[in-house]
Amino acid sequence: MKFHEFGDHHNPHIVLIHGGGNSWWNYLRQARLLSDKYHVILPVLDGHGEEYQHEYVSTEQSAKEFLEYIRKHCNGHVFAIGGVSLGGQIVMELLSLDSHIADKAIIDGSLCIPQPKLAKMSLFFVKCFGKLMFGRAACKMQLKLMRKMYPKMAYPEELERYYLE
């Protein structure tokens, strides 16, 4: 797992975790806006973005990695932690491991009630199509489509250059 950091490390820490099929750049605008007053940490989950070569293991494993990172680099506590979709699942798992790790938590688009059938089906699709859904090629396709479909929401050119090379 890789971490992109914005702002002064002495400011309160905010961790924003992207969803499946996305990467740290999902929160780039927010990080730039918040970095004047906060130390913003944008992780890249294994199997996503530039970490596509590392296999994503599980929500539980990712939460343990975040717990270790926060303990080591943020004195064991952050002001806020947020996640969307898969990122939100990881936030919930992280809070179950240490409910005092953050003052605030923002969870969007994540399942709060276990769905075993959905989990099995999701695992099947990720095993069969994971490289197509979450690899570098998928990132390139998303960036191209974003510019065409939602030009006002397109990512900065430096990100497009990085991923489209």
Regions found by a protein language model. Give the residues of each.
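Conserved HGGG/HGGXW glycine-rich cap/lid loop of the alpha/beta-hydrolase fold
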Residues: 5-52
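Structural signature of beta-strand start/N-cap positions in the alpha/beta core
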Residues: 13, 39, 78-80, 103-104
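Active-site signature of alpha/beta-hydrolase-fold catalytic machinery across serine-
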Residues: 29, 93-97
